[in-house]
A protein has these predicted regions:
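Short, charged/polar, low-complexity loop and linker segments
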Residues: 49-67, 88-89, 99, 125-133, ...
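Charged, amphipathic alpha-helical oligomerization/scaffolding segments
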Residues: 71-74, 78-81, 85, 103, ...
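C-terminal accessory extensions/subdomains outside the catalytic/core fold
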Residues: 19, 23-37, 244-298
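Long, charged all-alpha helical bundle/coiled-coil segments in cytosolic proteins
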Residues: 101-181
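Structured alpha-helical bundle/scaffold domains in large eukaryotic membrane-trafficking regulators
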Residues: 91-98, 124-127, 131, 161, ...
Length: 298
């Protein structure tokens, strides 16, 4: 038996009305129950629970850590910029008089100390009572650049490479008075990895310094740098495997720098009796141009 269209539509409307009435009654009962439990409030799906309170606390903690990470990262960038300026200033030493050399090294020493007492100390204060390994990636680039500048300055003063213990000592800030003597001193964590990568960067600066010394007839300094680079290369080879992908690329640059210094010293030994000292740098530049032109283009 067929049901008329009007009757079928009437039944549908009746069902819809019943559903609306049922939902309305359910909502009314829910609101009444919420008012009895929490007067003046209305229950909702976002009602606070203990679990949600915990997640809100976790969110605040993460926001604080992210903000601190960003501040440390910005300070690290400033350390990188200022350390590069110190390195560039010391690269101007070849050809200067002894008095000018001492003045420039003194200025560089003051700049390094200022970096330590301002930017790096700010990083140490940010990391007080924090796990430094959670933030080490934020300041590793600046720390490596600072170690490169410090080791370059130390080499020009003493002819040796600064030790890891010395770097950590310079970045440990003790208490200012006796009342704070019992407090744990502030410090920037210098992992062996950062120290090794920073010293690896030094080899490129020593190579540039050596080539500049050739044109100023400071031949003894060239041979000294060559000997130091050879000793460093042997030390790096003795390290074995180090879980740092950056070290592989730095070692490639290290080998290239050592090769250039050895070639410069070899050419210097052969030609210093034939070519004036002020022309040797032009000779080396000519050789470099010939080698670069002979390399096939990929």
């Amino acid at each position: 038996m067929l049901i008329p269209v009007e009757q079928n539509q009437s039944r549908k409307n009746s069902l819809v009305q019943r559903l609306v009435l049922l939902v309305s009654q359910t909502m009314t009962e829910a609101v009444s129950a919420a008012k009895e439990v929490l007067p003046g409030t209305i229950a909702s799906p976002s009602q606070d629970t203990v679990l949600m309170d915990l997640f809100r606390e976790y969110s605040k903690t993460l926001d604080k850590k992210n903000d601190k990470y960003e501040r440390v990262y910005k300070a690290s960038r400033d350390v990188t910029v200022r350390s590069k300026r110190v390195i560039f200033s010391m690269q101007r030493i070849p050809g200067l008089s002894e008095e000018e050399r001492e003045t420039l090294l003194g200025t560089a020493s003051g700049d390094l100390r200022d970096i330590e007492q301002t930017l790096l100390k700010h990083i140490a204060m940010e990391l007080r009572d924090e796990d430094p390994y959670q933030f080490v990636n934020a300041y590793t680039a600046g720390l490596q650049e600072y170690i490169e500048a410090l080791s370059f300055h130390h080499f020009l003063l003493t002819g040796s490479i600064v030790s890891h213990e010395e770097v950590q000592r310079r970045l440990t800030y003790g208490p200012q008075d006796e009342a704070q003597a019992a407090l744990v001193p502030l410090s920037v964590l210098v992992r062996p990895k950062e120290y090794i990568l920073g010293v690896a960067d030094l080899t490129g600066e020593l190579m540039r310094f050596c080539i500049k010394c050739v044109s100023t007839a400071d031949f003894d300094k060239c041979y000294q740098i060559c000997g130091v680079l050879k000793a460093m290369h042997g030390g790096f080879l003795s390290l074995g495997y180090i879980p740092a992908k950056e070290l592989y690329h730095k070692m490639m640059v290290f080998k290239s720098s050592l090769h250039k210094v050895e070639e410069a010293c070899y050419s210097l030994q052969l030609r210093k009796s034939e070519v004036p000292a002020d022309m040797l740098s032009d000779v080396f530049a000519m050789y470099d141009a010939e080698e670069n032109s002979s390399v096939p283009l990929l």
